[in-house]
């Protein structure tokens, strides 16, 4: 805890420096856990501003989660877009999947499809199969059962234990 206080500014009240992206990221996580939303946002933005190849995308993803949870959908989308644009092997695909959810909630289906497709194209072992399921859900509600069926089948074929099982259920529902 003392280290977090020191990062938060210590006796002089200085913010975490741009040269300490790991500290800023971890401070953001800690403050978020403690319910200090404004402090967490500030710390995550510090980490994002650092352009650190690991912590900037992680902070962008976490900021997207935080903002979305607190109703700032536009801010969440912007944070997720930063994570997606980073091309980070872990955070980019998951952020793309979450960005798809936000677009879907806003009935911006073309953007949702593109975001889900970006997660699928990443080949990420978790985000891609789930994006296949979510894309199938979107397409089945979008009156394109054939494309939905193809997306569900890809999720089944992925072998992901949960996503494949859920996709198989949806696929069976389309068949009946």
Language model: regions and residue ranges:
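Canonical tetratricopeptide repeat
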Residues: 26, 62, 98, 134, ...
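Start-of-helix register in tetratricopeptide repeats
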Residues: 22, 58, 91-94, 127-130, ...
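Alpha-helical segment of the N-proximal tetratricopeptide repeat
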Residues: 13-50, 58, 65-69
